Amino acid sequence: MLEVTSIHKGIVIDHITSGKGLKIFQKLNLDKISSPVVLLMNVSSKTLGKKDVIKIQDEVDLDLTMLGLIDQNITINLISQGEIAEKRQVKLPVKVKGLFECKNPRCITSVDDYAQSEFTLVPNGKIQYRCHYCEELTEYKL
Amino acid sequence: MSLKGRHLIDPNQLSLAELDNIITLGLEIYRNPNHYREICKGKILGTLFYEPSTRTRLSFESAMLRMGGTVLGFSDANTSSAKKGESIADTIRVLDDYADLLVMRHPREGAPLLASQYATVPIVNGGDGGHQHPTQTLTDLITIHHNKGKIENLKVAFCGDLLFGRTVHSLLKTLSRFPNMEFVFISPSELKIPKHLKDEVIKSNNVEIVETTFLEKHMSEIDILYMTRIQKERFFNEEEYVKLKDSYILDLQKLRNAKEDLLIMHPLPRVNEIHPEVDTDTRAKYFEQAKLGVYVRMALMALQLGVIESC
Ligand SMILES: [Zn+2]
């Protein structure tokens, strides 16, 4: 199996459903950061069979809120001094700012740069968000 | 809580007590307009109408002028300083200093909310696309209160375009917060009330609702009949429109089983959904409704400006 050495300090985004790693890589703009980053695809996993993993070395300021929108199986490991200092499960974010657009073509957010899209999760079992401005529901799809 | 300095973007920002306060004051001003002729002396209302709506604008202007204040503004975004491409935030940052209260009408949904984030003076939503029109809702509520003496225990029928009808959505959401309301939705199947709204209304207060395509079906039981326009272009086929258009024209014949104290309302303008023969019926209150709209706007603005604390 392909081996990548463990990191001393940084973030490991683990248990990504196989095939979604690249999307997350792009959504987090990881091609634009200066720290070392690896994207592992189709790594074997005990629970998932196959998974993708992203390892980011050093402390990088990332908005990880959106991970919950993409894949709720994901675990985030914060690594410090070669050990897992914190393990986080991702959740569907309740409030979302700017990550996607309101689907309502009549919404002010579609024409005014000052109106940054802002949503609140609607607890109805679907991944639906209510727009702060026009109140229309937008279903989140990657 | 005081309304002084507060924005009004969505009628649900007002508690039932605050709604009651505005309506009671509106009726007080309606009965004694001379007492309030000078309360807004020195105050300026700015009317920012990014799309024309003469009735709404004139209602606000009349309300301010009747309280001794003055008005300035524009009624067409293309010929005004708020030219295309300028952000609402920038327009507000400038105009905010020109007036003590601003009313904004905008074709984009959420525009007045955006404006309120940059304004230091109160913003009133004068209608944003198909979204909200809170002062129309206040107008409807004051009309109900004036004629029924209460806003509770009423069976209200909405007839017409219930799918796109902004005034219906806004009023319905607000009415469903009052105790023991029942609703009848009368519309063609293509223009039924949106499901999410229906669910929300039912959940909010366990209210009873009925849906039908026939105007007369529940006529004898209802306390209020709220008529709206049906536009031909909303229909997918001409045949369906022709079949239904006549059944939603309210005439005296259709009112023969109605209650003696039925309240017939319409946000106006009407096209042909209420036959002129109904106008002289004592139950027809749509012109009174437009008139009361001025007084409820006077009450709202007086409270927002803080020239009256409460009544
Ligand atoms: Zn929106």
Swiss-Prot record, chain B:
Q: Name one Pfam family in it.
A: OTCace
Q: Which residues bind L-aspartate?
A: 84, 166, 229
Q: Which InterPro entries match?
A: Asp/Orn_carbamoyltranf_P-bd (IPR006132), Asp/Orn_carbamoylTrfase (IPR006130), Asp/Orn_carbamoylTrfase_sf (IPR036901), Asp_carbamoyltransf (IPR002082), Asp_carbamoyltransf_Asp/Orn-bd (IPR006131)
Q: Which family does it belong to?
A: Belongs to the aspartate/ornithine carbamoyltransferase superfamily. ATCase family.
| Positions that bind carbamoyl phosphate | 55-56, 105, 133, 136, 268-269
Q: Which reaction does it catalyse?
A: carbamoyl phosphate + L-aspartate = N-carbamoyl-L-aspartate + phosphate + H(+)
* Keyword vocabulary terms for this entry: Pyrimidine biosynthesis, Transferase
Q: PROSITE patterns, alphabetically?
A: CARBAMOYLTRANSFERASE
Q: One biological process GO term for this chain?
A: 'de novo' UMP biosynthetic process
The name of this protein is Aspartate carbamoyltransferase catalytic subunit
Q: Which SUPFAM superfamilies match?
A: Aspartate/ornithine carbamoyltransferase
Q: What is its EC number?
A: 2.1.3.2
Name of the gene encoding the protein in the UniProt record: pyrB
The task this protein performs is described as:
Catalyzes the condensation of carbamoyl phosphate and aspartate to form carbamoyl aspartate and inorganic phosphate, the committed step in the de novo pyrimidine nucleotide biosynthesis pathway.
- State the pathway, as annotated in the record: Pyrimidine metabolism; UMP biosynthesis via de novo pathway; (S)-dihydroorotate from bicarbonate: step 2/3
